[in-house]
Amino acid sequence: MATLEELDAQTLPGDDELDQEILNLSTQELQTRAKLLDNEIRIFRSELQRLSHENNVMLEKIKDNKEKIKNNRQLPYLVANVVEVMDMNEIEDKENSESTTQGGNVNLDNTAVGKAAVVKTSSRQTVFLPMVGLVDPDKLKPNDLVGVNKDSYLILDTLPSEFDSRVKAMEVDEKPTETYSDVGGLDKQIEELVEAIVLPMKRADKFKDMGIRAPKGALMYGPPGTGKTLLARACAAQTNATFLKLAAPQLVQMYIGEGAKLVRDAFALAKEKAPTIIFIDELDAIGTKRFDSEKSGDREVQRTMLELLNQLDGFSSDDRVKVLAATNRVDVLDPALLRSGRLDRKIEFPLPSEDSRAQILQIHSRKMTTDDDINWQELARSTDEFNGAQLKAVTVEAGMIALRNGQSSVKHEDFVEGISEVQARKSKSVSFYA
């Protein structure tokens, strides 16, 4: 074995980095230190083996627990509603402080940690869960729908919100295909509707920058057949929004509270699927002026309207949920519906003017094979007090007459005869306003 002098004479890599204390040690002392290092290496190897064994045991436990979780999560689940979520730490701290004050003993093994929950199952059982289950308790809220194990009642998964099937049926699945070019003679009404409904949805940043609060909704009123529903569908198509079509008579139910529940579910569904346009047709069915009545049916209609008022006040205009209502009896509506802050924009749909009637006739006949010499202005002058729906009926009648006569195209005389047909069916005694 080389002596210290020989080691000093040799040029070894890292000599400059050696500690001066090590260089001053004797051979015996270096051998002793080497043995100590060997012992430490053996200890570290033993510790490494122990940790490796513990890691393998832990992996086995994790695998076993995953298998148990998989077995427990097998469908079907029992459906339950979360009643309350409680923080057990606060409860235990309070009980422990009271027990300490009274000189009692505290059993640390039984102290609960974390959050607990109270759930009510579909089998009408109310169960307290000190351990919530596989769902993060911080994400649970009262009234949430969850799936629980039918034996242990542990929460296994969260379920989507439950809505009334009648409300789900109100959602228009197919996107409306109407455009503003399909609506004739309503340029002013289109502009007002775009300002109230479309712009707040598509350019919300502009309203925010200017500090303007967008209207919550709009009320369209006017005689039947003037294009209220058509314009609402065109508005929904332009905004790419979910379209919920509520017919107000559907909200009048036989049982007490059913109509109000439908209104609540409709607005909850609209918030979940935002941006959404809620279109309430024939609003006068539930929005009539309130009056004293002994009949339960009248009181139920009034309760439904009060729930509608509450929902109009309850959601912010920033929620990308807009309400469009249509009626042909604006004179019978309750003043509470018409006040500012609910249906802010009131849009009147009058009977079309002469130029508007000519435009509507051209829109409805643009896909028909017609002669070039049709005088649309003359036809418009002949259809005084016709609404949009009756003008469409004129074009249909003209097409049927041309088909009946074996013609290859629709002539001006066919439109004149179609006007006569519709005029004959038009009752002069019908009044749309009381």
Swiss-Prot record:
Disulphide-bonded residues: none
GO BP terms in the entry: positive regulation of RNA polymerase II transcription preinitiation complex assembly; proteasome regulatory particle assembly; proteasome-mediated ubiquitin-dependent protein catabolic process; ubiquitin-dependent protein catabolic process
Compartment(s) of residence: Cytoplasm; Nucleus
Membrane in keyword set: no
SUPFAM superfamilies in the cross-refs: P-loop containing nucleoside triphosphate hydrolases
InterPro entries the record matches: 26S_Proteasome_ATPase, AAA+_ATPase, AAA_lid_3, ATPase_AAA_core, ATPase_AAA_CS, NA-bd_OB-fold, P-loop_NTPase, Prot_ATP_ID_OB_2nd
GO molecular function (one): proteasome-activating activity
Residues with PTM Phosphotyrosine: 180
Binding site for ATP: 222-229
Post-translational modifications: N-acetylated by NAT1.
Keywords of the record: Acetylation, ATP-binding, Cytoplasm, Nucleotide-binding, Nucleus, Phosphoprotein, Proteasome
Record PTM N-acetylalanine, positions in chain: 2
Function: The 26S proteasome is involved in the ATP-dependent degradation of ubiquitinated proteins. The regulatory (or ATPase) complex confers ATP dependency and substrate specificity to the 26S complex.
Family in the record: Belongs to the AAA ATPase family.
Name by which UniProt lists this protein: 26S proteasome regulatory subunit 6A
Gene source species: Saccharomyces cerevisiae (strain ATCC 204508 / S288c) (Baker's yeast)
